[in-house]
Each structure stands twice: as structure tokens, then as C-alpha cells.
A protein has these predicted regions:
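Short S/T/G- and acidic-enriched coil/turn segments that sit immediately N-terminal to beta-strands
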Residues: 245, 420, 447-450, 540-545
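Beta-strand-rich modules
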Residues: 546-567
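Extracellular low-complexity, O-glycosylation-prone stalks/linkers
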Residues: 425-426, 514-536, 540
């Protein structure tokens, strides 16, 4: 018994040490997303939802605010996020949005926040200790009445407000008195969309303007090398191509000029898509990052998540965001690390899956098809339901991401008393199983749990066993296993061709001979051979229709193959006029 106790203590210490050494993260970020609080948004099924994120570094911690969460999060490392429940609306605010697309800014030793409103009776709240629910009113009624607001404090201590969300009106800007926190003078028109020039600004899943004019929203401003970068989201939050663009000026209220590289934040491929309506910020080590909205759009247009990517300014002061492998594991920030891709590949794309049961048409293969929009669902949420994936060969497993889906949930709004419990098992032969991860006593809500193993494990089969569901049936949109296979990276893709439509240069058709040993590829393009900042991950295809180009811009393209063993050689850079 003493030996068993000793072994248990050692295993516990190793487990704690492994958790403390977490060095990576994976999008969508794993926070306890609240459920939509709006009844008519959940008619197709109650579901988690948030969007429009802002991350601000304040007193050594990162603070994350987003739409309709009945609170906010703080973190010391950008991985472990701690939720602080808080209602900012007053009883006379007869709206569901708590808060919608909040603005967060720092003045001295104080953090301030306000949500979107067209009314002029919303307070701006302030706190010097936001790790706890310790807030008071800075002003009881902000007279600007701004939707999708954001604030920017300039080097000279002048404060500016930027706002707007419309498919008719522009984004606005105006000065705000630093002391009274009230607007000064009239608002100014700043920028509007030009989708007749910019293909990516066109409305629709396929950028074809087939339903209504596109939306411009989510203003955000950063200053770099004396210039102001006014960022905005377009064309619609429900689309894979939801992205952030940027205009630049020498003055905080313009005039602004469209940056040649746009959109700067874009993620139209992969497991989860979208990278629009966000915020650009610096970490403790002065590295730049961009946080944005990611799209699910199954049970409602506003079913969304949050992603974080490394960003920066190049030698020509071009703002960019690196979304390549943007839902694979990346390194958390340190003094020397800035969101670098780990090189851990997806090991189980479209591999065999077995399950304990299936509910309706939510089939097992949906859990490994690399689409967050589809999911497998068990018949119940009972303890003992399970899903098992076969890697096809013994491989090095470094990390696992468990993406839960919402099926038969019954929650409206935020709950802080729900949690997931599970066990992960591994086997070399599918018969003899060893415990890999034990979260059977977990008491936290982890809808997109990501586990970096302390050491790589050599195995072939991974099984996820349900112990307790936070809400609804046991449903998984992605059981994603990351690591390295045993073979060689894929061979270079041949005959990569880009045909740009001459009658409408916003469009192009990309075609290639697929690599026989690749499951996906990354398409890269940009405005110069050394500025291929835009990337699109495409699974199991040999063509892609691209409708995001700026009409009068020359582009450069390249493509690389991907498999379980690594990344193949990029094709030569191709100029397309």
C-alpha cells in the first residue's frame, strides 16, 4: 500500500509539472464561452457564442472582453483564462446584449470599459483592480452613443473614439475629453467599404454580394512609428472570409489611405475559419498579436468563437497577421517566442473512427473531417460514451484538442457551475489501453480543451471516454491529434497555376496537381515575393476559387503540401498581374 501511495504521489506531481510546463495553445482558444442569451437566436438549438474580442495588457495581466459573456477573463500567460462574472448593464437597459462588442482601454492605473449602444445613457465603467468584480462608474452616461466602439489614447494624452457598424454608413471618429470622458465636437466620417475594388469586402460566403451590401464594423486603432493604423472588420461576421482590413494615416482622424496588403487578418480555410472584428495588442515582451472572431454559423449566424494569432509590422511598416496553420498548435509568448508554429501535424484527418453510439445523422466521421461546422453526437451524455480514432500507424503524439459541440443544450446565457469530465486513453494495438490524461475530477468548463503532453507519446489509437458533459449530449466536432508521423514530408506540388479573371481582377482560379502523399496544402499570396502574408489551408482538393483580390494590385503566389510527417517544399513564387 505504501508503494502504491508513493507511485500515486509521483504520478500526481508529474501531472502537475506537465500542466505547469504548458508552452503551446491552439485555436479556437479554450475559454468557458457563454451560451447565447437571446431566445430567438437559439431557435435552431441553444449554443455557445461570442465574438468581437478585445485583449488589453493591464498591470501585467491580459484582459479579454467579448460579446454577451456576462463578465470577462484575465490571464497572466495568454493560456489560463480566469472568468470574472459581472453585469455591466443597469436595470433600465432593456436589451439582451451584455455587453456587445465592448470597448476596453487603459488610462493611467485604470481599466475602462463600455459596450455598444445607440443610446446616450450607457455608463463607462472603471476599475483599478479588475481581477475581481470591483468596478465603479467613470461617467454615468456616455453621450456619444457608439456601436462597436473603441478608444485610442495618443502619445500626447489626447483620447479618441472610433465606432460604427453598418452596410450603409462609414466608420466614424471623434475626440473625447480626457478628463470628462465626453465627446468633443462633431464626429467625422473616416472610411467606408469599396467592394467594387476590394474583392474580400464583398458580402457572402463566396464574396459574390448575392444577398445584401457588405458590412463594415469593429474599428480599432494602433500607432506604430508615428502612423495610425485604423482597422476594421468586413464583410459579414457569419462568413469564412470574415476578415480585418486596415487604413493608415499620419493623423488620428485621417485622412486615411488603404494599406496595400489587405485584408491583414484573414483565415478562410482549416478546421475553423474567420479572423475578423478583432484587436491588435502587444504582449509582456512587446510582441504584437491579433485577436479576432472565428465562425461556426450552424445554429445561428452569430455562433462564433475567438482566435489569437501572431502579428507585427514588417520593415516597410506593413501590418500583417500570421494565420498560417492558424488552428494548429503554436507557442505561447515568451521573451524569445512569438507564436511560432510548433511543427506538430494533424495525425488523424479522415482516419477511421469508432464510437459507442450515434444520435441521428451526427455520424462518427464528422469528428475527424476538419470542419467545426459538423459533429458526431452520442445517443446520450452518459458516463462511458466514447469515441476512438486510429492514427493508422504508431506515431509521436504531442498534443490533443477536444472540441465539444452543442446538441440538445438547454442553457441561455452564462453559467459558471458547468464542467466537462473525461479520460483519454492510448493504445498501440487497439486492445490494450493505457490512461493518457485523466480529467475525471475536472470542475471547469472546457469546450475546446487543449492538452499538451509533458512528453511525446508513441501510440496509434486515442480514445476519448465521457465522464460528465457540461450540457446536452456528448458531441464532438473535432477530436484532433497533433504530433509527427514516421515518414517523409510530402513531395512538392507540381503545375501550380493561377488564372486571374481579366474582366474582374478581384477573382482568380487556382489549380494544381495534388501531391499523392499530402492531405492538405497551404496557399500563400501577397503583394511582393517577401510579403506572402495571406494563407489559406485547403484540405483534399486540387483547385481553389479565390475572390478576395484587390482589382488594381499585382500579386505573388506560392503553395506547399502538408501531411502527417511535416510540410513539403514551397513552389516557386509566381507573379500574377
Amino acid at each position: 500500500m505504501k508503494n502504491l501511495g508513493y507511485i500515486s504521489c509521483i504520478l500526481l506531481l508529474l501531472s502537475i509539472a506537465g500542466k505547469a510546463q504548458q508552452k503551446t495553445y491552439c485555436n479556437p482558444i479554450n475559454i468557458d464561452y457563454g451560451f447565447t442569451p437571446i431566445p430567438n437566436f437559439s431557435e435552431a438549438g441553444r449554443h455557445r457564442a461570442t465574438a468581437d474580442p478585445v485583449i488589453t495588457l493591464f498591470k501585467g495581466d491580459y484582459y479579454l472582453f467579448s460579446t454577451n459573456q456576462w463578465g470577462y477573463w484575465w490571464s497572466s500567460d495568454m493560456y489560463n483564462w480566469h472568468f470574472v462574472p459581472r453585469k455591466f448593464l443597469k436595470p433600465y437597459h432593456k436589451v439582451y446584449d451584455e455587453l456587445c462588442a465592448p470597448a476596453v482601454f487603459v488610462l493611467g492605473d485604470t481599466l475602462l470599459v463600455i459596450g455598444s449602444t445607440y443610446e446616450k445613457n450607457f455608463p463607462i465603467w472603471m476599475s483599478t483592480n479588475p481581477r475581481t468584480d470591483n468596478w465603479k462608474e467613470a461617467v454615468d452616461s456616455f453621450r456619444a452613443g457608439a456601436w462597436d466602439p473603441s478608444f485610442f489614447l495618443d502619445d500626447d494624452n489626447r483620447l479618441y473614439l472610433y465606432h460604427g457598424s453598418s452596410n450603409t454608413y462609414p466608420l466614424y471618429g471623434q475626440e473625447v475629453d480626457r478628463h470628462t470622458l465626453q465627446p468633443v465636437g462633431a464626429r467625422q466620417d473616416l472610411i467606408k467599404l469599396h467592394d467594387e475594388q476590394h474583392g474580400w469586402e464583398r458580402f457572402g460566403e463566396y464574396n459574390d454580394n448575392n444577398f445584401m451590401p457588405p458590412f463594415m464594423e469593429g474599428a480599432w486603432v494602433n500607432k506604430h512609428n508615428g502612423r495610425y493604423y485604423l482597422q476594421y472588420g468586413a464583410p459579414g461576421t457569419e462568413f469564412s472570409g470574415y476578415a480585418d482590413g486596415v487604413y493608415i494615416s499620419d493623423h488620428p482622424l485621417g485622412p486615411f489611405t488603404y494599406q496595400p496588403h489587405n485584408p491583414f487578418s484573414y483565415k478562410a480555410g482549416g478546421f475553423i475559419r474567420g479572423a475578423g472584428h478583432g484587436a491588435t495588442y502587444q504582449d509582456k515582451y512587446h510582441h504584437w498579436w491579433h485577436v479576432s472572431t472565428m465562425v461556426i454559423n450552424v445554429k445561428n449566424n452569430f455562433e462564433r468563437r475567438i482566435g489569437i494569432w501572431p502579428a507585427g509590422f514588417d520593415k516597410d511598416d506593413i501590418l500583417y497577421c500570421n494565420t498560417a496553420f492558424g488552428d494548429y498548435p503554436h507557442y505561447l509568448p515568451t521573451e524569445k517566442e512569438h507564436g511560432r508554429f510548433t511543427g506538430w501535424m494533424l495525425l488523424n484527418y479522415q482516419h477511421p473512427v469508432t464510437v459507442s453510439s450515434t444520435y441521428g445523422a451526427y455520424y462518427a466521421n464528422n469528428a475527424v473531417d476538419e470542419s467545426i461546422k459538423t459533429y458526431w453526437c452520442a445517443a446520450t451524455a452518459n458516463t462511458g460514451e466514447w469515441i476512438q480514432t486510429d492514427l493508422g500507424a504508431i506515431s509521436n503524439v504531442n498534443a490533443i484538442q477536444i472540441n465539444y459541440a452543442d446538441q440538445d443544450a438547454d442553457i441561455l446565457g452564462k453559467r459558471t457551475d458547468i464542467y466537462h469530465q473525461y479520460r483519454l486513453w492510448q493504445s498501440a494495438d487497439g486492445r490494450n489501453w493505457k490512461l493518457l490524461v485523466d480529467k475525471s475530477r475536472n470542475k471547469t468548463d472546457v469546450p475546446h480543451d487543449y492538452i499538451e503532453l509533458p512528453q511525446p507519446v508513441r501510440t496509434r489509437f486515442i480514445k476519448l471516454e465521457n465522464i460528465h458533459m457540461a450540457n446536452g449530449k456528448f458531441a464532438i466536432s473535432g477530436l484532433r491529434i497533433f504530433g509527427k508521423g514516421n515518414g517523409a514530408p510530402p513531395t512538392e506540388i507540381k503545375s501550380f497555376t493561377v488564372l486571374r479573371q481579366q474582366s474582374d481582377k478581384r477573382n482568380a482560379w487556382l489549380k494544381w496537381y495534388p501531391s499523392n502523399d499530402a492531405y492538405a496544402c497551404n496557399i500563400y499570396y501577397g503583394i511582393a515575393p517577401d510579403k506572402l502574408y495571406t494563407s489559406i489551408m485547403v484540405y483534399n482538393a486540387s483547385e481553389y476559387y479565390l475572390k478576395t483580390l484587390d482589382k488594381n494590385t499585382t500579386y505573388y503566389f506560392s503553395i506547399e503540401p502538408i501531411n502527417e510527417n511535416g510540410v513539403g517544399k514551397r513552389s516557386p513564387v509566381m507573379k500574377v498581374e
